[in-house]
Amino acid sequence: MRLTRLKTENFRNLAAVDVTPAPGVNVIYGENAQGKTNLIEAIYLLTGQKSFRAAKESDYLRFGQEVARIEAEFTCQNREKTAALAYGSKKLAWLNGVECAPSELTGEFLAVVFSPGELALIQEGPSERRAFLDGAISQVMPRYMTTLAAISRILLQRNTLITDMQKSGNAAMMEPLLETWDRSLAKVAFSICHARARFIRRLAPPAAEIYMDICKRADQPFFLSYQPSIPAPQGADWADVSPAEGEAHIRAALAAARSEDYKNYCTTLGPHRDNMEVTIAGISARNFGSQGQQRSCALALKLAQCRVMEETLGEAPIILLDDVLSELDKTRRDYFLHGEHPGQVFITCCDRGAARTLGEGAAFRMKEGQLYLPAKRAKKRKEP
């Protein structure tokens, strides 16, 4: 996977960027608040995923502008492709020049981002880990996004119905309609549980290996487990359950939880309550891990995701390292800076020193939303 050209127009503070990155490592350096993270964000949005930053799409527009655009030329599986996004009164997307739903970019443009906020993956609640898991699955199985959209709609309808039933005082008359929603929910819930269990089964071994490689502590094994709010039938793993058995089991669980649903005016069981537990030496990394251990766990998960993507798709994703280089040990810094990762890498940092230790690749300076190319690569503008 290689980004061969990137253009932005009126995206956040970025001026008209038009850059041809190096095929290996690309270092973007500059002082804080110059636009480095904005550039990384622009690249990541081309995956069709939500931004890794807490932001509204209206924030993407440069002050005083009505439309922001991101355009890319890239190669994937030896095929040249293009992708584009536009943000204005509505969000638009194009793939190979043809307008499409933004979600259709998922699985076409492959990238994994590391940012200072990645600690939330370990430190925060289950929703952070579900989001990571669902985003990772979507990049290797794009149709999974349709399933996620479906369960969101079904849960909204089911929760609305439960509220109406409680307020009407005539819940019994409405139970047949609730059972209809239960059948719909069971179908998509099984698909999600099955996909999550299968992905975690593939993710866990490389994550444990990478964590061990980072920490060098054989007495602190890393373990990853799926903790669904509805356990699989008969103690099985959801990855091994058939659709018929799984859907019937989920319908029964929903029926058993109905009184609890009525009490809480919402659906209390389902994939929206799942967790992915990370433990070190059998102890919760979230509750008892040091910040260093938590950072290593997050890095191990992300690098394992890259490995699973490469094994599944035959293509190494682009790695985006946003202001995290200083948090990595020398071995990991060298891994990225010296081109040991099989794919393309973009690294942002404040210190120009990273550019000096760069192996084969390119260094760029970001200043006030302008990207300055090295003299030997510049066409119109040299670094001041």
Give the residues covered by each predicted segment.
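Helix-to-loop junction immediately C-terminal to a conserved catalytic motif
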Residues: 44
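Structural recognition of the conserved hydrophobic beta-strand(s) that form the central parallel beta-sheet
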Residues: 72, 344-351
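Walker B catalytic acidic pair
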Residues: 322-324
